[in-house]
Amino acid sequence: MVYVPGAEFRMGRDEKDGGDEFERPAHQVTVKPFFIDQFEVTCEDYAKFVKETGHRAPPSWMNGNYSEGAARKPVTAVTWDDASAYAKWAGKRLPTEEEWEFAARGTDGRRYPWGNDWKAGLANADGTSNSIADVGAYNGTTPFSAHDMVGNAWEWTASNLRAYPGGRLPGNQPGGELKVIRGGSYESTKEYATTTYRTGWPARGAKTYDQTGFRCVKDVSQ
């Protein structure tokens, strides 16, 4: 895990800066210090949890086992409840979307973890590859040295999808409780694989999304 100091930062992106309805308006948020996983939870990590607890394996795994060569790839096709159960087992929790965004961009309002301009080859997105990659395979780290916070796999957060203060959400959202997912995947374009783009995915039920994984956070002991 890597340490993220507490700070006030400007969350979201205004329309004049290219923000869409999900991202705007930009607003001030304060987060307390925390630790965040340097990498997304891998198939290898998740398999230990499945073996120890008897929790169901992702439906994409054959006979409860991940495919050959996938040990260091992010675990995907997990529901929000699956991700939450893993986090609890690991003595951690899922990040709020405020924590996730701050860990991805820091205090200077950057659009990508490395700066404001897209740079090909720093993240697994925008046509870089046609498949998910091992964690840490790309060097586009955040100000706090976390890897893969844009591209590769979407990431669950603890937060419900809600409009930002003074904003609104598009009217075509699926029904049910939606949890915020962040970061985009290897199939995302550079417009969506950003530190600010957000969307929601149903939290409950057996439906999974094969490009969504997660990472965990841990509170700093006081």
Predicted regions, residues:
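Short, surface-exposed beta-strand/loop micro-motifs that present aromatic residues
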Residues: 27-28, 37, 143-145, 205
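Functional-site microenvironments in short loops/helix caps that host divalent-cation chemistry
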Residues: 4, 8-10, 14-16, 56, ...
